[in-house]
């Protein structure tokens, strides 16, 4: 049985022991590794630092009968200490995190883990050497190895919690199929497939997902391949959809309870979008540790991954709802949900007090004029204010940062209650509640940002939101362009939204994404090449400040169309054939347009 020990100080280490010390941000390099013990050092110069994702990764590396030591001074008051990790998820501000650490402490007590200044057992010794493990497949793995190749389904989804041998199984399956089929492999990270390749003991061609899509689009790869997708839920859904609908047979593996937040909503969403026969296979038997391992159970409850336990508090219930209804819900989301500043929640329950749906929102705007102008000029990028800053930069709308707004970060409805109007009613109730609660200083607008699909665009339009921006490129996390929509509340907000819509629609036909999204948007757009005052303001910020090419794309395009012969330096921006030294080229572009600024 594995152990977790909380230590208040770092004890002396025996001679001959070499510790491999790494920053929390590099924890992913330990995925797939196994150790008899590990140290997780929470100490920080200004308090503590607890990266939940890194902690979950390290838990998964501890072998049976191994120990994870958590170094935490003043454990008795940990919930009162400043957690420096909050800088990542709390708008750049470190804060105390009482709600999360109360949750943490409750579970330490529940599972009876040791909290001490000195461990009862001898501390870290030189690890014993173990003979190399021979691969022995469990009955579950053997069953899949025998039955999956004979099953006629076109899509096979292998799911399991961590440490169940998915990658080993996938490697053996790939080896079997390679005897008669052309087998290829893809994954979110090439580093994650080493276990598959080691088990397969043959060379399986690997392609990054975007490379594979490019080969499909240029007709350089046949559909007559068998594709393995490792940790499929880490890959954006639109990419999975294209891959899953192209190759003749696809085998996906993914972790159901994962530090990366793959979410239980993954299978629901993927299967709906794949119009092919599908079969699911599951692994339950842990290989790295024993059944009912306390450390695994503790971590699952810490990350709110246990479906069988009914959450006691509203935050935990809401997190479960997000995990069920959304594609990705991460450990960082959990930390933010428990303790981040500037958050707002609105939920609705049925008569049995079951959480039906909820909105998670954050406050934005009300920044000073000096800061707003610095953001517009490209000189400042403070954390937070996602939509407000984007509209200020990409939309050339400085006032977006100064007005008072609320951004709907997440909206979720229980999967069995979707498409019944509950989400729309929730949005209506939330907006009425926000207006009522902000009478002293009225809200100017409510915003939302989401991966643009026809379904979601229709939903938000039906609820009165107006489209004001679309990201020029697809977001790596979702695989979609992100849309930003606003609902005006105050008179000032109405004037602002009217202006934002007008500018967006004026620029739309010149945007690089317009041909792709034209049918989805259903907005009649005409090319308008004549410069106006907003364009000149935009170009002044590009030429004499630090506004980016993306921020000024349409204004630069209008200027280029009018003065093409004199501004050949701008051509790469519109042909997407950039010079090798882009930094030098960018500065040359800034200088080149200065004579044209009015």
From Swiss-Prot:
Entry keywords, A to Z: Acyltransferase, ATP-binding, Cytoplasm, Nucleotide-binding, RNA-binding, Transferase, tRNA processing, tRNA-binding
Entry GO CC: cytoplasm
Matching Pfam families: GNAT_acetyltr_2, NAT10_TcmA_helicase, tRNA_bind_3
N-acetyltransferase domain segment(s): 332-490
Gene Ontology MF terms in the entry: 18S rRNA cytidine N-acetyltransferase activity; ATP binding; tRNA binding; tRNA N4-acetyltransferase activity
Gene3D superfamilies to which the protein is assigned, alphabetical: 3.40.50.11040, 3.40.630.30, P-loop containing nucleotide triphosphate hydrolases, tRNA(Met) cytidine acetyltransferase, tail domain
Main location: cytoplasm
Reactions performed catalytically: cytidine(34) in elongator tRNA(Met) + acetyl-CoA + ATP + H2O = N(4)-acetylcytidine(34) in elongator tRNA(Met) + ADP + phosphate + CoA + H(+)
Subcellular localization: Cytoplasm
GO biological process terms, semicolon-separated: rRNA acetylation involved in maturation of SSU-rRNA; tRNA acetylation; tRNA wobble cytosine modification
SUPFAM superfamilies, per the entry: Acyl-CoA N-acyltransferases (Nat), P-loop containing nucleoside triphosphate hydrolases
Residues the record lists as binding ATP: 141, 163-172, 288
Domain of life: Bacteria
Binding site for acetyl-CoA: 411-413, 418-424, 462
InterPro entries assigned to the protein according to its UniProt record, in alphabetical order: Acyl_CoA_acyltransferase, GNAT_dom, NAT10/TcmA_helicase, P-loop_NTPase, TmcA/NAT10/Kre33, TmcA_C_sf, TmcA_tRNA_bind, tRNA_acetyltr_TmcA
Enzyme Commission (EC) number: 2.3.1.193
Stated role: Catalyzes the formation of N(4)-acetylcytidine (ac(4)C) at the wobble position of tRNA(Met), by using acetyl-CoA as an acetyl donor and ATP (or GTP).
PANTHER family attached to this UniProt entry: N-ACETYLTRANSFERASE 10, RNA CYTIDINE ACETYLTRANSFERASE
Family: Belongs to the RNA cytidine acetyltransferase family. TmcA subfamily.
UniProt-recorded name of the protein: tRNA(Met) cytidine acetyltransferase TmcA
